[in-house]
Amino acid sequence: MAKRIIYNENARRALEKGIDILAESVAVTLGPKGRNVVLEKKFGAPQIINDGVTIAKEIELEDHIENTGVALIRQAASKTNDAAGDGTTTATVLAHAMVKAGLRNVAAGANAITLKKGIDKASDFLVSKIKEQAKPIADSNAIAQVGTISAGNDEEVGKMIADAMDKVGKEGVISLEEGKSMETELEVTEGMRFDKGYISPYFATDTERMEAVLDEPYILLTDKKIGLVQDLVPVLEQIARTGKPLMIIAEDIEKEALATLVVNRLRGVLNVAAVKAPGFGDRRKAMLEDMAVLTNGQLITEDAGLKLENAKLEMLGTARRVTINKDTTTIVAEGNEAAVGARCEQIKKQMDETDSTYDKEKLQERLAKLAGGVAVVKVGAATETEMKDKKLRLEDAINATKAAVEEGIVPGGGTTLAHLAPSLEEWANGNLSGEELIGANIVAAALTAPLMRIAENAGANGAVVAENVKSRAISEGYNAATGDYVDMLAAGIVDPAKVTRSGLQNAASIAGMVLTTECIVADLPEKKDAAPAGGGMGGGDFDY
């Protein structure tokens, strides 16, 4: 395909145009008075949402060059979402502000590479400052505050997430399900999550989220490699007669057997999914035994004289629900509390007996997975559109609370970044010079962008609010919900330090990359062939 090549200022301006479009679409959702965005869907009802990264993923522009700008800034949102699970809109607004100011300087003749060095140094300085300011989470009240802010000021959701964390512990897992009623409910069940995803993406049952969800499946556990499909045939025939799904956890499944499973899954003969067993060596075997206890099944291992081809239905485990994505598997089982309790006691004894710190750590991990359980939040709403929006908000809230537990909290509402701007300017003036100093000042100027946008979305003057906040004490900021200046920590308006840090780092990284762009190579739009001429009427000198 023919390519279009654009250089220098033209290239950067085209990128900027795409970045402007995406940033504006996402920024309208920022803050307690941020608005929603409607996404048109080719199939099904339109989606009304308030989630930055979801909006960013939907935007595709007709112009290939502008679309490259959209893709670059989308990366800042996606990376922040992957690292912290929230703060995607803030990352987009920050990246946009840095790019706009940086491009002005590059157009005026500044060296883009030196500017980028200044931006990177400023970013490192700010990350260390955010770590200094972060306060550890003291109690479930602080967790509830983080959840409330991330869920769009929904106190009920914040409290529910705090309760869930109390019940399953910091090591436990909180997952989301679509509920059957209007109310959002919390349900805590025994369960286990491990870091292995499906072997083949063809096992996914939900293609939009790329997840395999199996309800009430049988679970086949084995510590051997499954190479031949003949080994599986007897058990597959027994499962097919029951009409229930099957989940296979094995050391590995080789090509022939895997191909057979995939074909059966795609043809609808058997709803099956397969994952590799977690861990290595003896530890893998121990984890498989944990799963056998949890699911009330048997580990099919030759050490116990059991062979795969002789496996019976009663040897398989069962679960209420299994959710598998590309990286993780969550097994929610119930009704086997006594056996699980006995297994936990056994692991605790092993922990007491071992002197190795590493072994203790791994045993603690197994204990948390076995005893921690899974809290399921059942999302309730009046309509499907509202449910999808609520689910995305809850997902953000759960991720934000986990991030807060990891790295602590800082004053929210864009306050922390705005207060860091004067510190950065002071540090940069003392430590940097020339164009590196200009790069750092670009970051300093961009730090107030999220606060200004939050204020503007609430109908206030962003520049005035930003100056007022900078002149106040470090924990004081602007409460956009009420229009007052308050102590943010006391008012419960807090952000996880990890979310603020990730957003800033990713924004600085993308801004640096855009500024140092000198040439874009993109596809030329394909010319559509003109419609062929119609046939003549015949009999005359001309075709009409």
From Swiss-Prot:
Highest taxon of the lineage: Bacteria
GO terms assigned for molecular function: ATP binding; ATP-dependent protein folding chaperone; isomerase activity; unfolded protein binding
SUPFAM superfamilies: GroEL apical domain-like, GroEL equatorial domain-like
Subcellular location: Cytoplasm
Example of a GO biological process term: protein refolding
InterPro entries: Chaperonin_Cpn60_CS, Cpn60/GroEL, Cpn60/GroEL/TCP-1, GroEL-like_apical_dom_sf, GROEL-like_equatorial_sf, TCP-1-like_intermed_sf
EC code(s) of this entry: 5.6.1.7
PROSITE patterns: CHAPERONINS_CPN60
GO cellular component: cytoplasm
Catalytic activity: ATP + H2O + a folded polypeptide = ADP + phosphate + an unfolded polypeptide
Record-listed ATP binding positions: 29-32, 86-90, 413, 479-481, 495
Ranges in a coiled coil: none
Keywords of this entry: ATP-binding, Chaperone, Cytoplasm, Isomerase, Nucleotide-binding
Enzymatic class: isomerase
The family this protein is said to belong to: Belongs to the chaperonin (HSP60) family.
Task performed by this protein: Together with its co-chaperonin GroES, plays an essential role in assisting protein folding. The GroEL-GroES system forms a nano-cage that allows encapsulation of the non-native substrate proteins and provides a physical environment optimized to promote and accelerate protein folding.
Assembly, per entry: Forms a cylinder of 14 subunits composed of two heptameric rings stacked back-to-back. Interacts with the co-chaperonin GroES.
PANTHER family in the cross-refs: 60 KDA HEAT SHOCK PROTEIN, MITOCHONDRIAL
Name this polypeptide is given: Chaperonin GroEL 1
